């Protein structure tokens, strides 16, 4: 999800069209666009860049399956006009990152490939560096990587990167150069992945901890779970998610308890809201939000 001017844009993964556009305040549907395909105006597996302020009806996504950045004119797309999407090559070094942030010529991102916690890629110099996994995490063996899956968020104003782990109840804070500043464990007991024979796979009884992380200038927001991974594929009514808020010293601030199970959310700082996606008991996928000022 992202916001652009008075709109909220949501990526649909299940079918065409690829993007749904809502009124940012009342969440009435305004339109949709984007078809699956290999053409310059098509999409296969797009993501929004993290931390971007999209204004003037212009936004960008990167498509990991098409290895391209797509510049989108939102108004042209909604009115089905030509030349609404322009494709630009995505640097091959960063293809496959589920979280991607830009700071000038530098990209920060992560990949679930066991190479490191996150990477720093300077396009101008061509230098690509992996930031090693912290020593408090289990060392990935052979080609296995899922055990150290994580999601990151980057603050350009603070010049810091936060990493939240899928299977560990740990959060790590780094500076722009990849130096570890601080780490915290959230919860009284240590949580880590349950591994199968010869540490070759994460077992379904492993607890999910943090499935998403967002941030603004003041706070870090973690989508927190406490459910076995095997149950997460078929959420039930009693399963609830939480959004845990930390400051940039990784000190605890508060927790928002959601009435649903969700794995994706957006902090709309302009409206002081948290918007999230959840599947209802009827099997529909709906948008929900709550006011952070209440």
Language model features by range: what are they?
Residues 39-42, 188-199, 248-269:
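Conserved blade-ending motifs and adjacent loop-strand segments that build the rim/top face
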Residues 120-122, 235-250, 289-292:
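Beta-propeller blade signature
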Residues 28-60, 64, 86-89, 140-141, ...:
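Blade-loop segments of beta-propeller domains
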Residues 1-4, 47-55, 97-103, 145-159, ...:
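Structural signature of eukaryotic scaffold interfaces centered on beta-propeller domains
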Residues 65-68, 72-106, 110, 137-138:
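Asp-box/WD-like beta-propeller blade repeats and closely related beta-sheet repeat scaffolds
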């Amino acid at each position: 999800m992202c916001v652009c001017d008075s709109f909220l844009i949501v990526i649909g993964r299940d079918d065409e069209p690829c993007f749904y556009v809502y009124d940012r305040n009342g969440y009435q549907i305004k339109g949709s666009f984007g078809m699956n395909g290999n053409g310059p105006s098509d999409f296969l597996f797009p993501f929004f860049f993290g931390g971007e302020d999209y204004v003037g009806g212009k936004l960008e996504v990167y498509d990991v399956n098409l290895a391209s950045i797509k510049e989108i004119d939102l108004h042209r797309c909604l009115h089905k006009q030509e030349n609404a999407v322009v494709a630009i090559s995505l640097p091959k070094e960063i293809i496959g990152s589920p979280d991607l942030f830009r700071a000038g010529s530098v990209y920060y991102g992560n990949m679930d490939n066991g190479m490191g916690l996150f990477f720093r890629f300077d396009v101008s110099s061509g230098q690509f560096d992996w930031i090693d996994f912290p020593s408090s995490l289990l060392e990935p063996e052979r080609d296995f990587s899922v055990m150290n899956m994580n999601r990151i968020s980057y603050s350009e104003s603070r010049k810091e990167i936060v990493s939240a782990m899928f299977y560990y109840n740990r959060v790590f804070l780094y500076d722009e150069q990849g130096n570890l500043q601080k780490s915290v464990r959230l919860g009284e007991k240590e949580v880590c992945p349950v591994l199968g024979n010869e540490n070759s796979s994460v077992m379904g009884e492993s607890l999910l901890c943090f499935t998403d992380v967002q941030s603004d200038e003041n706070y870090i927001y973690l989508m927190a779970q406490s459910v076995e991974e095997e149950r997460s594929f078929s959420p039930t009514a009693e399963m609830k998610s939480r959004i845990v808020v930390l400051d940039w010293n990784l000190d605890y601030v508060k927790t928002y308890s959601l009435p649903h199970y969700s794995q994706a959310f957006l902090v709309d700082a302009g409206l002081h809201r948290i918007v999230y996606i959840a599947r209802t008991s009827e099997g529909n996928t709906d948008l929900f939000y709550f006011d952070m000022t209440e």
